[in-house]
Amino acid sequence: MRDPNSETSNFGNSFNAEDRRTITEPQTDWRVWQDGAVATQFVKERRGAILGGATQLEVMLELLPPRPPNLAPTWVLDLGCGDGVLLETILRHWTGANGVALDGSPTMLELALERLSIFHPSAVSFISEDINLPKWKDALPVLQFDAIVSGFCIHHLEDERKKALYAEIYDLLAPGGVFINIEHVASVTPHGEELFSRAYVRNIVRRKIERGEEGIFEDELTHFVNRLDASANRLTSVETQLQWLCTLGYTDVDCYWKHYELAVFAGYKKN
């Protein structure tokens, strides 16, 4: 009988980051997330296994600027909102704020609508748009936001589009506003890639066992490496992306949290 937590199988011993890069040569792009099965599987299975997920949300809240004075309306934009967990966290913190949940996946927007139904219907707008195209901004209900956040979305864009999007985000920020990106970034070394994959899969296995399900490390690692959405990733190092933000005029740019390939980085618009 195999030990579900064992990492000593033939596959486990032979797996390395080079294998991962070979498997994930671009074959799909962000549109794979329009597949309802892919979106649902991430939210139901992998989202909860993200390393340091709760800490990422805590750091995000710490990075928020003070609320606008004189009871001015507060607006938050969640780009690639997924199931809406980032926006929900901020709206609970900033009571009475207005939110915009934007995603290109119909399934994700449905999940976000369900999660965010706890807020008044007029408080949250739901928008289906492709952030690969600059016209995504045309669908926004307002053109100035106190906070713009994104979680595990922008890494699906090619680098040139990432940089252009960061410029578009900067233009949409109110003076003193913040852009916070909770993101999957590229490891500097193949060793880092391998450590990330193993740590993530150990969390997946642990969660399955806690639910009374079978969780075999080698099987889950194989599934994780060969998952359909893996080849949609266009990972870029956090150092490179911080430099882009600085060049665009963001201030107090930094990586405020990082664990393997997961990072929380942010920048502000000068008052």
Could you tell me what each predicted segment is?
Residues 137-148:
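A short acidic, Gly/Pro-enriched loop at the edge of an enzyme's catalytic core
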Residues 146-160:
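A short SAM/SAH-binding and catalytic strip from SAM-dependent methyltransferases
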Residues 163-175:
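A short glycine-rich, Lys/Arg-flanked "PGG" loop and its adjoining helix->strand segment in the class I
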Residues 251-271:
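Core SAM-dependent methyltransferase catalytic element
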Residues 7-71, 85-86:
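Conserved class I S-adenosyl-L-methionine
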Residues 75-79, 85-134:
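Class I SAM-dependent methyltransferase SAM/SAH-binding core
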Residues 184-246:
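C-terminal alpha-helical "lid/dimerization" subdomain adjacent to the S-adenosyl-L-methionine
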Residues 176-183:
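Conserved beta-strand signature within the Rossmann-like core of class I S-adenosyl-L-methionine
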